């Protein structure tokens, strides 16, 4: 709130890929006073499995969208018409497949996290959404490799 001239760009591409009862919340929902200076970006690649289709969208104050449109129209061609039609169909069509895909992603997440946490010196927190994990190798620092070298840092670990 200290810097009202600063715009906030919120990438909400993973909003539908959440697990274990976690609910996605936008920044503007958490702090409504930020609504008028928040640009929310999203796309079709993650939840709708349309990677490579290059379909995205954003919500922002009208005057900013107008300026963004002027800039975009001068430097980037449009998304293919078939991709646009597919995106509209995906957004307006049945959404039950998202839950099925999330169950598959959750199963994979649980397996990866479990296996990482079984590895000596590795720890990994369970992510609440998306499909990325961020394991820590801190528990290996100071240990020896099978070749007898001491692991001094993350680069030695790799």
What residue ranges belong to the model's regions?
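PLP-dependent class I/II
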Residues: 1-158
